[in-house]
Amino acid sequence: IIIAIYYSAEHVWRGRERKIHEIADATPLPNWAYVIPKTAAVSLVLIATMLISVVSAIMVQLGKGYTDLELGKYLLWYVVPNVFPAIMIAVLAVFAQALSPNKYVGWGVIVLYIVFQIVASNVGLEHSLYVYGQAPQVPLSDLNNAGSFWKGAWWFRLYWAAFAVLLLVAAHLLWRRGTETRLKPRLQRAPARLKGTPGLIAAVASVVMVGTGIWIFYNTNVLNEYRTRDENERFMAEYEKKYLKYENLPQPSIADVKLVVDLFPAERRAEVTGRYLLRNLTDKPIRDVHVRETDRETKLLDIAFPGARLASHVEDDGYRIYRLDQPMAPGDERMLTFKTQRWNRGFRNSGDDTRLVENGTFLNNMELAPAIGMDPSGLLQDRVRRREYGLAPELRPAKLEDMSATKKSYVGAGWSTPDITLSTEADQTPIGPGKKVSDVTQKGRRTARFVSDAPILTFFSIQSA
């Protein structure tokens, strides 16, 4: 940014500082013949700086004896994605200088842009639709490459590219010719300069920007849930106030779990049917059973709990309380069945789900199925923010002297023998906990069943790649 600030001012104001601007401005060259080359020059300086960093990184690799340089990844994963922000900065820098009466005011405009980027998140403007040139980060891996994550980033880039074109048109309209540097007279002449090709370009860019903006909003805010940082913190604070009081409430343990997981990697979708055998391992009767959705990405579509009625359910919280018709005595067992779905539709503004991907899915049971009972993990941790929301300064672990805490671990108190049937695309390998007892490929699907031959803690994962 510093390079763009300096060189844009030098390019735009050099003629005036050397007193040759009246000669150049008297030529029949159109304004765009000044704007475009200067923008391209600043862009090339920034891109050259980036390429120098690539050469430096390669030299470090070679100096350490590493010869598998993978130049294609330098190009596709570093150079190409960063060319766009370089051009965006160059356009903004040249526009700021075209707008300003002198280069120092232009520098001030760019500084204001930098300050805005820093404080935008603090005033609720975190969405990439509001921050110039910003696009979501693209998660990269050797196994999945960029997957489908690149699509959202390029939609944002198209949106901001259209806006950058509007800035270039504005720079063309406001470009100084002759001795006049005041903004007001240039604004008065702008409508006349907008006629013809500049107006057509501005109209097309406006249509593209509005169209892509609507599409981006539909994906990030309709197909997917979008929350600002403050909204997310407020949600966690309210969630804690409602449900943390149930943390030490006696709950049944999962004694046996059976899952049928159908993965559709190309769609980044998982359909799960499950069954829990719940057992009361406490020494007290249990009247209420708390069922909690532990992952925002996974939706609990259906649940059946014979012998119980739904006493409380807040859908946005994903928290259900069931009142048993007959309390569970110590040692009693009950059956609970459910259906869940995890489906990554469209693209997001940030925080992409990298657990369920085209190649390299890795999901644990808490990301596929509901949990029993309340757990403090995932709540607001920052002490300052907790005080602002009227919460205790921090969530402390149980004291060493608290022997009741030994009755439950991070993943619950009981042990279970998972029975997992996992299906995926025919060209991928499914992996689950336990011993593989069957593996069949038919109709383009590969289905494997895994059964644990010994009890394990109810915390396991499945993979497909």
PLM region spans:
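A surface-exposed beta-strand-loop module
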Residues: D295-N359, T406-Y410
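Transmembrane helix boundary and interhelical loop/hinge segments in multi-pass membrane proteins
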Residues: I5-P30, E180
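Terminal transmembrane helical anchor/hairpin motif
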Residues: Y66, K103-Q188, L223-E225
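Secretory targeting signals
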Residues: I1, I36-P101, P139-D142, F149-G152
